Every structure is written in structure tokens, then in C-alpha cells.
């Protein structure tokens, strides 16, 4: 997963690379690359994600990082950025050739969440079958995704990555979406991982609802006269919660104290605060609060629109 997202973010995804001797000689699962063949980096990522091609992983590492060691440096740097505090990468494919190559289920979930925000990664991860022309032969390469949850077992699965080594045993990271709720499941050393993931997803989809905690647009109930009718957030805040958890949610608004020069010059920072969402005292989301100075003409227009909307919905207004 890390190797794939770094390849995609490198800006070289459509670059053609030449497969080296060291890439062809990697042990384990393979997409059977040929030394000296020229292949697009994007095709290598498909071979990596769908067929666990260790040869593809090395070819990607050499193309993006200049060498395997150079690429491993990029992997650990990205892991630090994502917050994977219990992860150390030592190679681009995950084989048991380094003692300190290790991670956790939680860190893998953080990585998958990060990667799934990339459209190209999401598309590749969710591909069931990929076909590409073989550069050296008359026949095409056809790769079927090893993720059986995606291909046959679970209709709500949207992607993932399988894995196996002698030390880690069966490992599996998958994603699923149902009724607007996106979930990630991770298992390590789990012999019955397909059923484990389905069970976790079904349990979560049954118990959790996507709950709206704050609506995109203008913030109401702002008491400060300087900020009143001037503040907004740019996105809806929605979070999966059980009915019991919904009662433990708190929304807190923190604003910068208005400065004298703001009132004198009218020059106010774009971001003037934040909206924090807490569940049982733990921060689950934080959204910037933006300031937008409206002219009296704009305010009059928007007030009329608001009153009209209230009248159409049958609600009463103070005016």
C-alpha cells in the first residue's frame, strides 16, 4: 500500500521504466517481469496491488527512489507524516528479509485511510481485473485481484490488499462502503480473515449510523456581535456513531478575540477559529472556521432568502 501510494504521488505514474535484473530476481509472488522490458509505472502499481508482485515493488522502488534504500527512506518519511508511530519499513514489498520491518493493524488502517483519499489509488485498489499489453509477447497480461472480498465474497467491499509472509502469516487490509459509510478493516495473523472482515463490517454497518454533527455554511448562534452572521465552515461534519455514542458528543467553538485594528481597517484573517467535535472527551474532528465580511446589500439579500425559506417550510420568523 505504501509503495503504491508513493508511486502515484511521485508524479511519474505515466512514466515508462526499464525493469532491472535485481527486480526480476525477487522471491515470492510475482507478475513475471522480464529483465530489460519497458513498462509504465502505473502498470507496475496494478501488478503490485492486484497480484502482490514483489518484482513490481522493486521496479517501482528503483524508478521512484533511485534505489531500494532511497525508496525505503521515502516510505519511512511518509509513515511519519501519516502518524504511523509503530511502523518501520525496510523494503518495498514486505518480505521477511529484515528483522525490523514491522507495523501494526492500527498503523495499516491509518495508511489505508490516507491512500484511499487518492482517486488513482482508490481506482486501482477497487479494480477486479486489469488487462495490459505485454511489451515482449503477442498476448496480453491479465491480472485478477487476489482480494476475494472484492471479487466474489462481499458486495460492499471497495478495495484492499492481501498479504502473507512466514512471520506475519495471513494479513489483510480491506475497505467497504454502505449507505455513505466508509470503513476499513485490518487483520494480522488471521487464518479466517475473509470471514473476519465480513463479520466486522456487518457489525459496524448494523450498529453505527452516519450522524450529522455540523452543517456546511453559516454558523448560527454566534453571540459575539463582530462575528455574528459572518462565520462559516466549508464542509459538513459527519461521523459514524452508535445511538449511545450520540449522547456523548460535544461541539465546541473556539474563536480568536476580535482585534481593534480589524474593526478599524476591515482586514480580518480568513481563518478566525475552529469547530472541535468531541466524543466522550476525545477529539474526533476539527474544522476551520472562516470569516467572510458581507456588505449591507449582501446581508439584506441573504436575510430575505432566509425568511423566504422559513416561510416556504412553514416555520415562523421573529421578523
Region spans (language model):
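Active-site-adjacent loops and short helices of periplasmic peptidoglycan-processing enzymes
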Residues: 1-119
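Domain-terminus/edge residues, biased toward the C-terminal soluble/receptor-binding domains
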Residues: 99-319
Amino acid at each position: 500500500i505504501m509503495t503504491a501510494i508513493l508511486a502515484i504521488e511521485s508524479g511519474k505514474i505515466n512514466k515508462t521504466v526499464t525493469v532491472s535484473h535485481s527486480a526480476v530476481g525477487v522471491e515470492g509472488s510475482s507478475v513475471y517481469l522480464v529483465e530489460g522490458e519497458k513498462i509504465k509505472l502505473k502498470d507496475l502499481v496494478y501488478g503490485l496491488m492486484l497480484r502482490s508482485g514483489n518484482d513490481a515493488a522493486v521496479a517501482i522502488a528503483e524508478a521512484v527512489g533511485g534505489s531500494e534504500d532511497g525508496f525505503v527512506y521515502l516510505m519511512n518519511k511518509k509513515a511519519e507524516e501519516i502518524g504511523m508511530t509503530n511502523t518501520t519499513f525496510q523494503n518495498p514489498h514486505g518480505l521477511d528479509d529484515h528483522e525490523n520491518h514491522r507495523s501494526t493493524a492500527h498503523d495499516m488502517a491509518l495508511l489505508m485511510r490516507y491512500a484511499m483519499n487518492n482517486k488513482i489509488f482508490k481506482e486501482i485498489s477497487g479494480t477486479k481485473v486489469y488487462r495490459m499489453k505485454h511489451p515482449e509477447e503477442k498476448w496480453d497480461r491479465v491480472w485478477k485481484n487476489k482480494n476475494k472480498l472484492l471479487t466474489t465474497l462481499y458486495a460492499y467491499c471497495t478495495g484492499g490488499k492481501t498479504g502473507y509472509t512466514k512471520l506475519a502469516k495471513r494479513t489483510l487490509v480491506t475497505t467497504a462502503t454502505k449507505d455513505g459509510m466508509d470503513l476499513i478493516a485490518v487483520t494480522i495473523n488471521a487464518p479466517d480473515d475473509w470471514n473476519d472482515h465480513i463479520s466486522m463490517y456487518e457489525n459496524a454497518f448494523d450498529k453505527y449510523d452516519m450522524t450529522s454533527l455540523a452543517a456546511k455554511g453559516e454558523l448560527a448562534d454566534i453571540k459575539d456581535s463582530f462575528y455574528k452572521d459572518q462565520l462559516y465552515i466549508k464542509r459538513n461534519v459527519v461521523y459514524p456513531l452508535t445511538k449511545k455514542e450520540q449522547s456523548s458528543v460535544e461541539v465546541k467553538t473556539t474563536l480568536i478575540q476580535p482585534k481593534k485594528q480589524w474593526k478599524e481597517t476591515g482586514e480580518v484573517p480568513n481563518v478566525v477559529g475552529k469547530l472541535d467535535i468531541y466524543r466522550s472527551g476525545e477529539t474526533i474532528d476539527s474544522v476551520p472556521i472562516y470569516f467572510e465580511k458581507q456588505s449591507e446589500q449582501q446581508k439584506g439579500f441573504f436575510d430575505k432568502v432566509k425568511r423566504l425559506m422559513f416561510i416556504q417550510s412553514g416555520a415562523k420568523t421573529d421578523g
